[in-house]
Amino acid sequence: MRYIAGEYDVCVVGLGHAGSEAALASARLGLATVGFATNLDAIALMACNPSIGGPAKAQLVREIDALGGEMAVNTDKSLLQMRTLNTSKGPAVRSLRAQVDKKLYQANMKHTLERQKNLDIKQAEIVDILVENNKVVGVVTKLGAIYKCKACIITTGTFLRGRVIIGEVGFESGPSGLFPAKELSEAIKRLGFKMMRFNTSTPPRVDKRTVDFSKMIMQPGDEVITPFSFMHDKIEIEQIPCWLTYTNEKTHKIIRDNIHRAPLYTGEVEGVGVRYCPSIEDKVMKFPHRDRHQIFVEPEGRDTYEMYIQGLFSSFPEDLQMEILSTIPGLENAKIMRPAYAIEYDCIDPTQLKATLETKLVEGLYFAGQVNGTSGYEEAAAQGLMAGINAALKILGKPPLILDRSQAYIGILIDDLVTKGTNEPYRMLTSRAEYRLILRQDNADFRLTEIGKEIGLVTEERYEKFLRKKIQLEKEMMRLPTVMVRPTEEVNNFLISRGSTPLVSGVDLYTLLKRPEIDYKSTKFLDPTRPDDILDSVAEQIDINIKYEGYILKQLRQVEQFKAMENKKIPEDIDYYQVHGLSNEAKEKLSKIRPTSVGQASRISGVSPADISVLLIYLQQMRRKRSDEAKIN
């Protein structure tokens, strides 16, 4: 029997990484919000790797933080180890990667949700979405409780009709032994949404006491920890190392000889898998010329013996997993605590969404996270934040927040999903960013914090911290060209020691800092008027902005061209089948996606440059016609 149990502005279904951010954003913007999880002990569950960040993902985390989200703050509070990746490369691809205590991460996020004003969290399985006149009006729990709402955000991750496969054994399940959400998947289909079936896999966890680390290569954290959150100046903890080992020909032979027992190869798994996170059987079969593959052994927490075997994702039966482990140096006697498994699940075709992550089909219904066909905690959290923000802004009667491709990786992620869709689990990559030199992890606050403040998500404390940094940077960038450096013996000895050419005449410090061998901090002795309180993060900005000035200016000019196309808006009521000259494929794709700008239309697969030219002419004629009609009236 159904009954009214409560009424809220926003209901969030699922409290993983997307759901947690969505619920917090909505509540922090003043909306009465309720979040549902099938198990409150699994909030922000790290069902796969116990880490946050990495290339492109770190940029997302920093952007979430700059807008006032929680992931970076929670990562810093749960840290085991921090490493900066790609340090030998340019700043565009440098990325933080944090190893975290996964249980502490969950506990900290639950603690944050429980104490958030305007937010209730409840343990319940949602089985139906109530819709009236194409508008969402509520959700229903398995026990019959109805929660009325003005907006609903679906963030169900891999739970929709989840099915776990380990070798010959397959059974209905969510990740990590949790219950799947079967009825909700059917409810979403009944509303008319097109569904897809994807899969992902996770490696075994082994007992630390059975691992021989003497046969592995230690992977320590950075000597000085760089916090993920802009709110934290420093973190001082005892870091726990990760370890590196390799597969070998023995490993590969076992896999080749038993490939008929891998469900990912036998057809037992029907979902489409992750391209950039392949199973070990995939790696061995697709790259036969490789004589070894990296295996990272990573801690899952400070107070557990479980170790995560990164690189050994698999759907093989447990006996074969044990045999494979026995061939790897250091893991010969490792005891499995949790076997590897593959999980397949339902997700929606994301082209059914607007750029706000609201569905085109049902007003007030939003989707975010892996249910949109993405992979990764960071991608999920970014979508959750944006869905929470936009659901709240819609209810408050305010304009939506849509970040474009030149503003943030978040903008690229959402634009790719709603414009191009995906036929496999989507992962964020730096190569997807056209303007990655200006979308760095180090400048996310400069790009987005003022936007976060404007919508009301950034706290006064965060904003004041940001302003101090911004003012310091602006003052230094103006002061440095006025500081003259003379070709003294001391100066030239310093330059020679750095592998740089000695000076023959005076030069300003701004120009000197353009040299790749010279960094801002090392020139303090040349600069007597330099303030003593310059932040490390400001020093980093100075070096990057000066050294890459030419490239940054070039990219900013490209952004201007991009913006020009984005600013050419397309009327909502346009009938593409009436646009003569468009190819049939373009008519079909444009009618399905309903792009809001010519720029977005140009990124749709199947829409050619010739189609865009036709569309531009049509829009010009349309505007002229409407202008003439307005004059007559």
Swiss-Prot record:
Molecular-function GO terms, alphabetical: flavin adenine dinucleotide binding
Record: residues binding FAD: G14, L15, G16, H17, A18, G19
Cofactor: FAD
NAD listed as a keyword: yes
GO biological process: tRNA methylation; tRNA wobble uridine modification
HAMAP family: MnmG_GidA
Name assigned to this protein: tRNA uridine 5-carboxymethylaminomethyl modification enzyme MnmG 2
Organism per entry: Caldanaerobacter subterraneus subsp. tengcongensis (strain DSM 15242 / JCM 11007 / NBRC 100824 / MB4)
